[in-house]
Amino acid sequence: MSRPSSAGGAAGGLGAGKAGGSKHGGSGGTTASAAAAAAAAAAAAAAAAAAAGVSGSVAGSGTVPAAAVALPVAALPGQSPELTALFECPVCFDYVLPPILQCQAGHLVCNQCRQKLSCCPTCRGPLTPSIRNLAMEKVASTLPFPCKYSSAGCLLSLHHSEKPEHEEVCEFRPYTCPCPGASCKWQGSLEEVMPHLMHAHKSITTLQGEDIVFLATDINLPGAVDWVMMQSCFGHHFMLVLEKQEKYEGHQQFFAIVLLIGTRKQAENFAYRLELNGNRRRLTWEATPRSIHDGVAAAIMNSDCLVFDTSIAHLFADNGNLGINVTISMC
């Protein structure tokens, strides 16, 4: 039996309800750092020009034409990790990506950390006014940057424009607590998800077998409510979620979905069926389970799950309790 988690519940329980009834250094490194940045830009520009067959000097300013700099990564022979390391943020150790801003002494810090700082973390000098480092931006456009989750096993290196989007969906990023509506802020590896659920969310029931009945009690509770249950079969764990939301005043909808405690690739090996039965009526939904990396919110937003309103729920409910037949199968 799955009891509801309503607003104001404890965070350690069955997915607490949604709030409101809804569900270093001193100044000595200044010159050296600025010189290193300038040297890196000059070296990359020279290498790019050589690879493109540009010869001779440019009259006037002594700069290399832009077309000679904006080359693909393969056009930079002898590229080394030392060059990429020049873009390392001294605060978070991720990479400083365009638009690249520097302090008055030439030190770099990523835009995310910059918003939290009042002075340069390297020289303690002012970060304002903002100074754009166009040379380093051109160098960055020629380099592949490792995914921020490379230490966790991701082997991809990407152009800076592709890096943020990849990291949003990277399979190696930390997993968050999959309990919907809970205020739990836990993060960890995939192997740690089930131990976390068993320790911090002990009220969640786990049923064994590929065919079970998910019984949601007290579906007439007001406001946004979540019901959660675990199902274990085929050597994997699945999370069953029934969520009630008030889409607009006076109109409530139920959303039911199955998540795999696993990766997206693992989820593709399974299919699930949700079925409401009663009074010679039947409502069925079949789909591939989502990975807990994807979560419930996106599926609900796109209605990519079993969706029904309160009038439908009452057709299948018995004394305010709703039973959903859940079947997991391997593809």
Curated annotation (Swiss-Prot):
Reactions that this protein is recorded to catalyse: S-ubiquitinyl-[E2 ubiquitin-conjugating enzyme]-L-cysteine + [acceptor protein]-L-lysine = [E2 ubiquitin-conjugating enzyme]-L-cysteine + N(6)-ubiquitinyl-[acceptor protein]-L-lysine
Tissue: In embryos it is expressed in all blastomeres starting at the mid-blastulla. After 20 somite stage, it is expressed mainly in the posterior part. Expressed in brain, including the eye, the cranial cavity, otic vesicle, optic chiasm and in the gut.
UniProt GO MF annotations: ubiquitin conjugating enzyme binding; ubiquitin protein ligase activity; zinc ion binding
Pfam family, one: Sina_TRAF
Binding site for Zn(2+) 1: 147, 154, 166, 170
Database matches in CDD domains: RING-HC_SIAH2, Sina
Domain of life: Eukaryota
Residue intervals of every RING-type zinc finger in the record: 89-124
Chain sites annotated for binding Zn(2+) 2: 177, 184, 196, 201
UniProt KW Zinc-finger keyword: yes
Family as reported in the entry's similarity comment: Belongs to the SINA (Seven in absentia) family.
Subunit note: Homodimer.
Descriptive protein name: E3 ubiquitin-protein ligase Siah2
